[in-house]
Swiss-Prot record:
It catalyses: L-histidinol phosphate + 2-oxoglutarate = 3-(imidazol-4-yl)-2-oxopropyl phosphate + L-glutamate. Pathway: Amino-acid biosynthesis; L-histidine biosynthesis; L-histidine from 5-phospho-alpha-D-ribose 1-diphosphate: step 7/9. It comes from the Bacteria. This is Histidinol-phosphate aminotransferase.
Length: 358
């Protein structure tokens, strides 16, 4: 007997495109050393104590603490926010999904400011919300007037990445406050906070509609373990704690985060190195007549190609073992994004780009 399983699938997901993730290094065909500059990871890796803890840990057969008590205690110390207001998850992606599940009824509207992090739209679509795009201006700054004009009675959430991914654009606290003053629940995604030092945490008592997301993927070298956290008003944290998966942070990630927080000064030193290297990379990229780099407050630099095709450059770099991200979406046509690595990674990238321009 033949069954048509498709007829049982949600009709709104029939054309769902999914997310295009970065290529795994083991899938790259090259004889060269892989230099991974496509996913904004910390190429210095996790703290040595994390790696040592992982090699000696012997509790993998035990379920993790569903409340993430110790992680939240350490994060409360780090952020200055009460641990009851902290929710942890399997990456900040999971928290984005949870927020949309909590706030969105089918047809409710979510304000998105493209070009920006794709997961805001991804999870809004998945949760049957309606994405209302308010495009950024030519310099990739948020259009605050456009956000105000886009508000309707159906508006339930606003997402703002600060700084923005994939453009690296910063947004001032004053501009964020203008958005918060609209009174709509607003998510400020501080995934790259450690690279810029600007946070809205101290504004939380003044804005009960302010929610902040962060991650251990970018600064802490734990991208492969998938750990993120959010800082929420008490009432929202309470609801999220009820609907989240009970074991959303696995026991290996739990142990790694504890060690990272105990060794955070070590990791923050690597952040300083990356910020210094970002300045050098921006200066050097500016010397190429066929590249237009944009200022960045994160750990990557976006470049628009003024000559040639970004896809061709991406493929040429990949053939040499250098992985970078290519974009061709609206307002991102013919763009490449370079993660900032170690000095030797920058040297290899600049050498390869220089040879292409000859």
């Amino acid at each position: 007997m033949t069954y048509d399983m498709k007829k049982y699938i949600r009709t709104d997901l029939e054309g769902f495109a999914g997310y295009s993730a970065c290529k795994a290094p083991e899938l790259v065909k090259t004889k060269n050393r892989i230099i991974k500059l496509d996913a904004n990871e910390n190429l210095y890796g996790a703290a040595p104590t994390v790696q040592k803890a992982m090699s000696t840990f012997d509790q993998y057969h035990i379920y993790p603490d569903a409340t993430q008590f110790e992680i939240r205690r350490l994060l409360a110390e780090y952020t200055g926010v009460n641990m009851e207001q902290i929710i942890c998850g399997a990456g900040s992606d999971q928290l984005i999904d949870l927020l949309l599940r909590l706030f969105i009824n089918p047809g409710d509207e979510v304000i998105n400011c493209p070009p920006t992090f794709a997961m805001y739209k991804f999870y809004t679509d998945l949760n049957r919300g309606t994405v209302v795009n308010v495009p950024r201006d030519a310099g990739y700054d948020v259009n605050i007037g456009g956000i105000k004009n886009a508000l309707t009675p159906k508006t339930k959430l606003i997402f703002i990445a600060a700084p923005n991914n994939p453009t690296g654009t910063a947004i001032s606290k004053e501009d964020i406050r203008q958005i918060l003053d609209l009174g709509v629940p607003t998510v400020i995604d501080e995934a790259y906070y450690e690279f810029t030092g600007q946070t809205m945490v101290t504004d939380m008592p003044s804005y009960p509609n302010l929610m902040i997301l962060r991650t251990f993927s970018k600064w802490a070298g734990l991208a492969g373990l998938r750990v993120g956290y959010g800082l929420f008003p008490p009432v929202i944290a309470d609801y999220l704690s009820r609907i989240k998966d009970p074991y959303s942070v696995n026991i290996a990630a739990d142990a790694a985060v504890r060690q990272t927080m105990l060794q955070r000064e070590y990791m923050l030193e690597t952040v300083k190195k990356i910020v210094d290297e970002r300045k050098r990379l921006y200066t050097e990229l500016s010397k190429f007549s066929w590249l237009k780099p944009y200022p960045s407050a994160a750990n990557f630099i976006l470049c628009k190609l003024l000559k040639g095709k970004a896809k061709d450059v991406q493929q040429a770099l990949e053939s040499q073992g250098i992985l970078v991200r290519c974009f061709d979406a609206p307002m991102m046509e013919n763009c490449l994004r370079f993660s900032v690595g170690k000095p030797e990674d920058t040297d290899a990238l600049l050498k390869a780009l220089g040879e292409m321009g000859e």
